Amino acid sequence: NFLLADEINRAPAKVQSALLQAMEEKHVTIGGTTFPLPSPFMVLATENPIEQEGTYPLPEAQLDRFFMKVLIDYPTADEEREILRRFNTISSDSIKQVISPEHVRERAGLVESIYINEKLLGYIVSVVAETRKPSRKELKKYIEYGASPRASIALMKASRCIAFMRGRGFVTPDDIKEIGADVLRHRIILSYEAEADGKSADDIVKLVFDSVEVP
């Protein structure tokens, strides 16, 4: 049910393409035989941003298939101490199942039932549209290509997840803002001017949200 694609940018393009096709179509074909993938089927891919030699960066269209891109920094001192404590105490024999596929599917159904009103759907559409045809001059020079409709769908789903985790049955504008960078940072293609000015994708996402009126 859960696949870890470690350092996916070290896999050749053909392997990347096969994985992303499986993510999209939920089945794989081997020797003319098609095998359905289990439900749920989730992929977590990692990239090492430091060492880029010998890597195969994912094309933008393939990156778009990933629901979110989460940045992982160094652990805090407390987190690192906990890593050291656990290092010699956890073995594969002590790892137990904590949730069943049925429970995951059940909770996914609950997330889909979270209410999001028409004004907030319009807000999501406006945010994503701002990445394509920016109203601010500053944004126009920094964005080469904006986000696709997949971004709107992902932002709606992710904001529902945030509301669910906060114990609410409805989405608020803050839910959308909170998860915005994770959903959009890999879907916006920056211009050379943005790179020259030292602007990150997160900087641009903040400008995008600042440019759109909250309903």
Residue map of PLM features:
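C-terminal engagement/docking regions of AAA+ P-loop ATPases
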Residues: K133-P215
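Canonical AAA+ ATPase core
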Residues: F2, E7-V15, M23-Y115, R160-I162
